[in-house]
Amino acid sequence: RGIQELLLLDEEGNEVSAWHIGGKTSLLIGRDEHKENVDINLQNTEYGGMADRQHAVLNYAAGQWYIEDLGSRNGVRIQNAKDGKMYQVSKEHPCRINTGDIIFIGNTRLGVR
């Protein structure tokens, strides 16, 4: 079935809200007051100010989701569900994400389900 949702998580790891991403192929993560230019809008989240307007992009290719940092100020990190380690995502080097991973957009946590 694969990845179907991104979850906004609080500091304790509880779900605050969710975005359905099943069936999509490309999603822009960022912040936008007008809610027009980004797919995953972090404008009104606790650490939304740490997200760039165009912070990262999720792309679906060959049955897998990948995240790429778009040259953001505060970076993109992934906490891998398998080994629990934190990985920095480099600009122009897409990184595969899997169910159970946690994506950090600055300090904003997005769970992968």
PLM region spans:
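DNA-recognition element of transcription regulators
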Residues: 52
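Intrinsically disordered, low-complexity acidic Ser/Thr-rich regulatory segments
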Residues: 1-49, 70, 95-99, 107-113
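Forkhead-associated
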Residues: 39, 55-57, 62-102
